[in-house]
């Protein structure tokens, strides 16, 4: 509901839904955000604080897709709570932070889409079994390549992953 869009159907009903939802956010937004932050902290403890894992979870690890969602939700809740103060709500993230967040989101989604496609199921663990295949797809590596060069591309992909989650983790800490 925080990022709802009217794709089809009655605009009047959609606007009424949005109005009622905003009223609920005004009443309970602080509590909702605190609950989301508590969920995040529990998830990070369950998954582990060490986000430099060899086989990371693209969705649940610290700095991953869940944290990006938390940032977006936090911004949307803040905007709803401060609807009359557009300057404040539009300045929550700098242009550089927005660009960094978008870049992280796009890279993590790219990894996750390739992972789902190659594993032929919902899968969020970037295991060794898929790292070579995904790096080949991302960097368009020719089939015939030395193991050393192949490892270079896997390392490049993982380095980009770590950079993305580090950036997201740093932005998430603004909200926690």
Would you name each region that the model predicts?
Residues 1-176:
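A nucleotide- and high-energy phosphate-metabolite-utilizing enzyme signature
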């Amino acid at each position: 509901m925080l990022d709802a869009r009217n794709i089809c159907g009655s605009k009047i009903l959609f606007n009424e839904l949005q109005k009622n939802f905003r009223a609920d956010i005004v009443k309970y937004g602080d509590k909702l955000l605190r609950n989301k932050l508590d969920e995040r902290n529990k998830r990070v403890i369950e998954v582990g604080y060490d986000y430099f894992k060899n086989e990371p979870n693209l969705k649940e690890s610290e700095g991953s897709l869940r944290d990006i969602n938390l940032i977006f939700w936090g911004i949307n809740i803040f905007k709803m709570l401060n609807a009359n103060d557009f300057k404040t709500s539009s300045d929550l993230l700098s242009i550089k932070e927005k660009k960094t967040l978008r870049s992280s989101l796009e890279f993590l989604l790219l990894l996750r889409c390739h992972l789902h496609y190659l594993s032929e199921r919902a899968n969020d663990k970037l295991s060794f079994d898929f790292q070579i295949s995904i790096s080949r797809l991302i960097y368009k590596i020719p089939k015939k390549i030395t193991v050393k060069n192949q490892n270079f591309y896997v390392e490049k992909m993982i380095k980009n992953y770590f950079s993305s989650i580090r950036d997201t983790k740093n932005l998430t800490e603004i909200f926690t």
